């Protein structure tokens, strides 16, 4: 029997458990609410089909689940409506009814595609998240945000659709290329900058242990991030105010991802640079102390994350992408800025010249 830590995302009738442990995807009772005789569709990508898919697929089949599968292409460039329609087609071809369950086995891209498909198939079916990347384990799998990209903007087509459960198996991280592990750390550091100075200090002391996949350090890291996000979602499920703080660095970072072409920059890499730009903006405005800015910079560098944007992307070219950000209201850009380590706020009416200067400092 594996040791499983459990958290609960409290959202009334949409509440669901988060299970965290090592080697837990083959535990008999882990796939709640599935039961023998239920229909399910496993959604994964070509890479994980060779690494992890059989562990889940055959375990569920042996458990009496009527399991089918659809294997998608791997990469951010495939987070599209066309790829999502492949899931819908597989559900229809295999005659899945409204009581089916989609199971997302993969990183943020698979989670988004499967979650969005679950939200629209026959007006909504259940889905289970099994995140396999650090980025998806600490962030993307929790909270119910699902989306696909558009050529003009990232995550512009989507919905809020909460999973029935989230199963975080730390052993899945062993399948990750090292740069993907590092990329995921950007979201971990984001939580610390925005919400928890003590956690930031802990990261400064334990970053090497996390990156070496030390079980104790990684378990604590993932659980802490999930706790912070769960608390926030319970207060603001649909990102009307507080939850938007989780977008630290994303307004700048998404501009990099779209401009460079989806998949050319890993999401966490772009967010790392975006957080540097946001921190520099805050410093220029007189909010963030220089000593805190430098601590953020040093931790990102020690993690192996980039702190400078693409050399072929001018500061001015960021602005059109940033104006298409989902936080824009009535034509006014809103940015999440750190005020200190452990505290952030949303600001609008920021002088564009300050934003441009902050971007130039990070090129």
Curated annotation (Swiss-Prot):
Cellular component annotations (GO), alphabetically ordered: cytoplasm
Free-text remark on how the cofactor is bound: Binds 1 divalent metal cation per subunit. Can use either Co(2+) or Zn(2+).
Positions annotated to bind Zn(2+): 187, 250, 267
CDD domains: DHQS
Binding positions (NAD(+)): 74-79, 108-112, 132-133, 145, 154, 172-175
Keywords assigned by UniProt, alphabetized: Amino-acid biosynthesis, Aromatic amino acid biosynthesis, Cobalt, Cytoplasm, Lyase, Metal-binding, NAD, Nucleotide-binding, Zinc
SUPFAM superfamilies to which the protein is assigned, alphabetical: Dehydroquinate synthase-like
InterPro entries named in the record: Dehydroquinate_synthase (IPR050071), DHQ_synth_AroB (IPR016037), DHQ_synth_fam (IPR030963), DHQS/DOIS_N (IPR030960), DHQS_C (IPR056179)
Family: Belongs to the sugar phosphate cyclases superfamily. Dehydroquinate synthase family.
PANTHER family in the cross-refs: 3-DEHYDROQUINATE SYNTHASE (PTHR43622), 3-DEHYDROQUINATE SYNTHASE, CHLOROPLASTIC (PTHR43622:SF7)
Known role: Catalyzes the conversion of 3-deoxy-D-arabino-heptulosonate 7-phosphate (DAHP) to dehydroquinate (DHQ).
Protein name: 3-dehydroquinate synthase
Gene: aroB
């Amino acid at each position: 029997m594996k040791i499983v830590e459990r958290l609960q995302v409290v959202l009334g009738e949409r509440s669901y458990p988060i299970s965290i442990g090592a080697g837990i995807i083959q535990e008999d009772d882990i796939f709640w609410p599935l039961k023998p005789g239920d229909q399910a569709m496993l959604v994964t990508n070509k890479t994980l089909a060779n690494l992890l898919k059989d562990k889940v697929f055959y375990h569920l089949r042996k458990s009496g689940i009527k399991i089918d599968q659809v294997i998608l292409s791997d990469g951010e460039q495939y987070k599209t409506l066309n790829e999502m329609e492949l899931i819908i087609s597989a559900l229809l071809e295999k005659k899945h009814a409204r009581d089916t369950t989609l199971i997302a086995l993969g990183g943020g891209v698979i989670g988004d595609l499967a979650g969005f498909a679950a939200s629209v198939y026959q007006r909504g079916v259940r889905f289970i998240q099994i995140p396999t990347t650090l980025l998806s384990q600490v962030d993307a799998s929790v909270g119910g945000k699902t989306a696909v990209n558009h050529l003009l903007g990232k995550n512009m087509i989507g919905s809020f659709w909460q999973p029935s459960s989230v199963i975080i198996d730390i052993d899945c991280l062993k399948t990750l290329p090292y740069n993907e592990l590092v990329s995921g750390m950007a979201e971990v550091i984001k939580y610390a900058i925005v919400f928890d100075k003590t956690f930031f200090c802990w990261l400064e002391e334990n970053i090497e242990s996390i990156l070496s996949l030390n079980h104790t350090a990684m378990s604590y890291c993932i659980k802490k991030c999930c706790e912070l996000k769960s608390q926030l979602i319970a207060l603001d499920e649909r990102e009307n105010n507080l939850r938007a703080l989780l977008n630290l660095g994303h307004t700048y970072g998404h501009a990099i991802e779209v401009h460079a072409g989806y998949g050319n920059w890993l999401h966490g890499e772009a967010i790392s640079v975006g957080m540097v730009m946001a921190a520099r903006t805050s410093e220029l405005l007189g909010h963030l102390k220089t000593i805190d800015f430098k601590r953020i910079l040093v931790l990102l560098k020690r993690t192996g994350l980039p702190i400078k944007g693409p050399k072929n992307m001018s500061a001015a070219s960021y602005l059109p992408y940033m104006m298409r950000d989902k936080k824009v209201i009535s034509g006014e850009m809103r940015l999440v800025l750190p005020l200190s380590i452990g505290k952030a706020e949303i600001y609008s009416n920021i002088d564009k010249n300050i934003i441009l200067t902050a971007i130039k400092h990070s090129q």
